[in-house]
A protein has these predicted regions:
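Modules that initiate DNA replication and primer synthesis
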Residues: 1-8, 163-175
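Helix N-cap/coil-helix junction residues
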Residues: 5, 57-58, 128
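Phosphate-handling DNA/RNA-contact segment within nucleic-acid enzymes
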Residues: 75-170
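Non-catalytic accessory segments of DNA primases and related replication-initiation nucleases
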Residues: 1-53
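Short, cationic motifs built from Arg/Lys/His that form the positively charged side of catalytic pockets
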Residues: 47, 56, 97-99
Length: 175
């Protein structure tokens, strides 16, 4: 004990604090959110096609449809990029999935992606099919090809309900 003070007061004295006042905690610096940007595409899509067709057994026509609609491509790191667009067709979300079939699998949503605009396809009928991952969506279409272009699909790219609510908001006639 220092200066015949109780233990707690002695510690406060050694720490340079008076009357038991503590220092205010520093406030964390707020980082400005980064603007959304799609990953840089690679020149060809051979690895993406090979992975989706050979490893995941997705039909070539289904892949080609989403590539043609600019909703699917291969990035410079040879990942599959699943693009989500808003009502005007502008890219607002991107989900990346590695084409690595051995070892660690890499999946992530691009920073600053708008979760309500995940990978989706709008149809003309009242059916909405909901999936956790984009590859699940493509697999379902491959396994159930009859009339698939008439249905609406959404992949939540995780467990958020926001993409489903946005599809229902955009098209109230969906079941």
């Amino acid at each position: 004990r220092s200066y015949r003070l109780p233990y707690q007061e002695a510690v406060l004295l050694l720490l340079g604090r008076k009357n038991g006042k503590s220092y205010e905690q520093a406030k964390p610096a707020k980082e400005a959110p980064k603007p959304f940007a799609l990953p840089e595409p690679y020149g060809t899509m051979r690895r993406m096609y090979a992975y989706l067709m050979r490893q995941r057994h997705i039909d070539r026509e289904v892949i080609s449809y989403f590539v043609h609609e600019k909703l699917l491509y291969e990035d410079k790191h040879h990942n599959c990029v699943f693009v989500g667009v808003d009502g005007s067709g502008e890219a607002k979300h991107a989900h990346i999935r590695s084409t690595n079939s051995e070892g660690r699998v890499f999946r992530m949503n691009i920073e600053s992606s708008a979760s309500e605009h995940c990978f989706h396809k709008n149809g003309t009928d009242k059916s909405l099919y909901v999936f956790e991952a984009p590859i699940d969506l493509l697999s379902h279409i491959t396994l159930n090809p009859y009339g698939w272009q008439e249905h609406s699909y959404v992949a939540c790219c995780g467990t958020s309900i926001q993409p489903v609510l946005e599809r229902l908001r955009q098209n109230p006639k969906l079941d």
